[in-house]
Design a protein with these regions (language model features):
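Conserved SAM/AdoMet-binding glycine-rich loop
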Residues: 1-61, 65, 70-72, 152
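Short, glycine-/aromatic-enriched active-site segment of Class I SAM-dependent methyltransferases
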Residues: 122-131
Length: 182
């Protein structure tokens, strides 16, 4: 890539846990040596019950291990989770177990999005039928506060600046955590 596009400053890729799992560490290091500097991966939740309900196809431990694999191979890791994904029933577990998954991976970047229900999806059907309740802004903020109270991912940049978020946050961990909580 650098030979064809010398002006290219960085190369990054989205990856699923499955696409990382099928690659050996040697293959991932080769990709790094060829210029791949960062991998974006969706965690969505660190709570296995949420992951099962949302049909993610992977459990938290596997996602964490694939994140660690990327880091071992010398690439930066950006991991995203979704506030509100556990609904009111799993709010606390979703927040705490997601923080624990971030802590275990210690990615360079942590991104938080707020759940948006897309028309025509199974989730939209569950909401319509009453089997899933979308959290309101106050509960999203409570969940975010709980996650921040439990997150301990030294050196990670925490971003919650997507248009879906009620409260934009951006800073480093752990130094900006208290500022976020205040």
């Amino acid at each position: 890539i650098r030979e064809l596009f010398p002006e290219c400053e960085r190369v990054a890729s989205y990856a699923s846990p499955a696409s990382i799992r099928i690659r050996t560490e040697e293959e991932l290091r080769t990709l790094r040596d060829k210029g791949l500097t960062m991998v974006y991966m969706g965690l969505e939740s660190g709570c296995d019950d949420v992951l099962k309900r949302m049909r993610k196809g992977h459990m938290s431990a596997e996602i964490v291990e694939m994140g660690r694999k990327v880091r071992r191979c010398g690439m930066a890791l950006s991991v995203t989770a979704i506030t509100g994904l556990g609904g009111p029933e799993l709010l606390e577990r979703h927040a705490i177990e997601t923080a624990e998954a971030f802590n275990a991976m210690n990615p360079e970047y942590i991104g938080m999005l707020t759940l948006m229900v897309e028309p025509g999806t199974p989730l939209e059907k569950w909401v319509r039928e009453g089997s899933f309740t979308v959290l309101g802004p106050e509960d999203i903020l409570r969940e975010t506060e709980l996650l921040l109270q439990h997150i301990d991912s030294e050196g990670s940049v925490f971003r919650m600046n997507h248009a879906s978020n009620y409260l934009p946050l951006k800073g480093g961990l752990p130094e900006d955590r208290q500022k976020f909580l205040d």
